[in-house]
Amino acid sequence: MSITKDQILEAFAAMSVMEVVELIEAMEEKFGVSAAAAVVAGGAADAGAAAEEQTEFTVMLTAHGDNKVAVIKAIRGATGLGLKEAKAMSEAAPVAVKEGVSKEEAEALKKELVEAGATVEIK
């Protein structure tokens, strides 16, 4: 007996957000792929043209480190989240702390989180 697409969708609908994140990570590992959106090159672009400089960045918390309280405070300050939400975000690493920010803002947030003891990436 095979599972139908509808049954898979129903199983997804019954999962919590954390369970879906864990499932996606397991699928990425098993199939050797990334869930990040693929960038499609424009057909009219010249092959020798330089890549357009990125203007929006995402600050990713990859680990909260040993000083979890300081990291939670930094997340709260940067995002305006409540204590419970900031704690959940720090525990869900890797997670996007802020998306669509300027390079300067991303660098400043990264510095703040690293000083608090977190491991951070800018994408």
Swiss-Prot record:
The keyword Phosphoprotein does not apply. Keywords: Ribonucleoprotein, Ribosomal protein. Coiled coil: none annotated. It comes from the Bacteria. GO terms for cellular component: cytosolic large ribosomal subunit. One of its GO terms (biological process) is translation. InterPro entries: Ribosomal_bL12, Ribosomal_bL12_C, Ribosomal_bL12_C/ClpS-like, Ribosomal_bL12_oligo, Ribosomal_bL12_oligo_N_sf. The keyword Ribonucleoprotein applies. CDD domains: Ribosomal_L7_L12. One of its GO terms (molecular function) is structural constituent of ribosome. PANTHER family: 39S RIBOSOMAL PROTEIN L12 (PTHR45987), LARGE RIBOSOMAL SUBUNIT PROTEIN BL12M (PTHR45987:SF4). Homodimer. Part of the ribosomal stalk of the 50S ribosomal subunit. Forms a multimeric L10(L12)X complex, where L10 forms an elongated spine to which 2 to 4 L12 dimers bind in a sequential fashion. Binds GTP-bound translation factors. Forms part of the ribosomal stalk which helps the ribosome interact with GTP-bound translation factors. Is thus essential for accurate translation. This is Large ribosomal subunit protein bL12.
